[in-house]
Every structure is written in C-alpha cells, then in structure tokens.
Amino acid sequence: MLSACNRMRRSSEFDATVKFGLRAVQSDVIIHVWRGCNRDETKAPHVGLIIAKTVGSAVERHRVARRLRHVARTMLGELGGADQVVIRALPSSRNVSSAWLAQQLRNGLRCALDLAETDW
C-alpha cells in the first residue's frame, strides 16, 4: 500500500504528468514519469494509477490496482522528491501474474527514468 504522502490525488497532477512526462510502454502497462523542476529531496515522490473500466469488472480492476501499488511502493527509493509517476493499466493486465506485472513495471520505470536522465 502506498502511504498518503506518496499518492497522487489531484487531476492537475495526473494531467501534467501524462502531458509533460516521458512515456515508457510495456505490453500490459504504460508508465509516465515527470521529473519536476523543483528537485527538492525533502518531498516525497507521487504515484498515481489509471485503471480504466476496459480492464474488467470492479473486482478485477481492484486486484490489478493492488498489485501495481504493491510494486510501486517497493520502487519509491529509485525516485526523486519532485518525481511524479502515473501508471496506466492496459486491459491485458488483468490476465497476467503479479510477478510478470512487477517485472514490466520495473522495466518500464527504469526505461522512463533513463530517458528522463538523458533529457534532464
């Protein structure tokens, strides 16, 4: 579970991250990473999830969200204080194992962070 200080809540944060952030596409998830201008390490990074109804029923969507939150929590150490991450689950994410979803999320986040470092 993500702590309250790490959760993205405002739609403006989601919009900015998706619009201005770098995107890494995996087969079951899309990761948007926006490295903020204010590189304040005392702040906590924010993570948000987008799980559309196309993923499945409410039970399936919540299961996917729980899996993604669990993996995202373990990767907070790789993020800077001003970083914002949006994870969009694709419909195929409901059919894959937790380990496969975790691997895709780690690979996608690593790819997006590498892109952000070269652009920064």
UniProtKB/Swiss-Prot annotation:
Keyword field contains Phosphoprotein: no
Annotated EC: 3.1.26.5
The protein's name in its UniProt record: Ribonuclease P protein component
One function term, GO molecular function aspect: tRNA binding
Role played: RNaseP catalyzes the removal of the 5'-leader sequence from pre-tRNA to produce the mature 5'-terminus. It can also cleave other RNA substrates such as 4.5S RNA. The protein component plays an auxiliary but essential role in vivo by binding to the 5'-leader sequence and broadening the substrate specificity of the ribozyme.
Keyword tRNA processing applies: yes
GO cellular component: ribonuclease P complex
